Amino acid sequence: DKTKQKIAFSFLIAIFLAAFEGVVVSTAAPVIVKSLHNFKMISWIFSIFLLTSAISTPIYGKLADLYGRKRIFMIGISIFLFGSLLAGLSQTMHQLIIFRGIQGIGAGAIFTIGFTMIGDIFTLEERSIIQGAISTIWGIAGLVGPLLGGFLIDYLSWQWIFFINIPFGLLSVYILAKFVHEQKPATNPKIDYLGAILLSIAIGSLLYGVMSLDEDFYLGVILLVITLISSILFYIQEARTSEPIVPLFILNKSSIIVNIITFISSFILIACSVYLPLHIQSIMGYSATIAGISLIGTSIAWFMSSISIAKLMKKYPTNIIVMFSSLILIFSSWLLTQLTIDTPLWHLSIYVFFFGFGFSGTLNTLTFIVQDSVKYNLRG
């Protein structure tokens, strides 16, 4: 119905903005460095956004279960927009890094609660269409982000890559506030503050530790040791608290397998997203526009695969769908490893089409499995 269409539209807006902010800074980086006069810290405007969003994601999931999806999702978007405003007003690189961190904190809610609310509001067939649209939005953000960023920088200023989020984000908030209705949780919420702190330390030290290994090996090792210690303490804390951030009973054999498959699939996706455009432009000698057009098949395949998943799940066991999709993903990934400077561009376009089909089939099926395997109050 029209109400669901409006709600889906608001989700797509929010997810596009968060995805857009993850990629657009790469286009603006040279101009930002020139404006704020600090080249040494340029990498932090990328990494801090990813770091804070990764830390906040599981915490938002639990808060959504305790206080309601709509409330926490709108708080997350508001934090994201506030960070966008401050980032655009930054006068120094230190300020920009801090405000990008605030953006990432808000983006964590968009990434996790958006998918949770889709599972709550829409039927299986509707979810498959929306998941396909979301996959397409991610692809569009990756392709259009640098182009739109370049346009804003050339005709306005680099600050507008942040300011542009505000009107669209407010539109998303308005639609959600008006059309999404949910019951308030029946129980009095209790927040596991210690668990949230330990989880934040574990994730933050892991990500920063891995990033530090090349430049400062000993610092990286120390941070990874901190990750191990804080993870053990987090496990102990979750085992004894009444409202754990991550209920330990969901960490069964099946969920571990799902997470491993998701991690590997996402790892491959990120690697391809980073290196394929570089290969097309730097190795094969094509323009950025041609690179974007060559990779658009990934988004098309994502959408096609997502639409077909719901129908296939009614006819075949989900493990068969995941296995078949994973085989397509593995085979297409192997094809991509065979790329050379002489590989025709249309070959690469076919490879990424199959890659997108396999990735979408794998990840979307796993998402449906996870959402349908737990109660409403644990979906976050």
What are these regions (language model features)?
Residues A28-A54, I97, T289-I293:
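Extracellular/periplasmic helix-loop-helix junction of adjacent transmembrane segments
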Residues D154-T262, I268, S273:
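Hydrophobic transmembrane-helix bundles of small-molecule transporters
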Residues I7-I13, L17-F20, V25-T27, F46-I48, ...:
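12-transmembrane solute porter fold
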Residues K6, M41, E126-A133, I290, ...:
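Cytoplasmic loop-to-transmembrane helix junctions
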Residues T57-L194, S212, Y376:
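Helix-loop-helix hairpins in multi-pass membrane proteins, especially solute transporters
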Residues L51-I55, L85, L89, G139, ...:
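Hydrophobic/small/kink-forming positions within alpha-helical transmembrane segments
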Residues F16, W44-L51, S78, G132-I140, ...:
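Transmembrane alpha-helical cores of Major Facilitator Superfamily
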Residues A29, A141-I153, L206, P277, ...:
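Small-residue (Gly/Pro/Ala) motifs that create kinks and tight helix-helix packing interfaces
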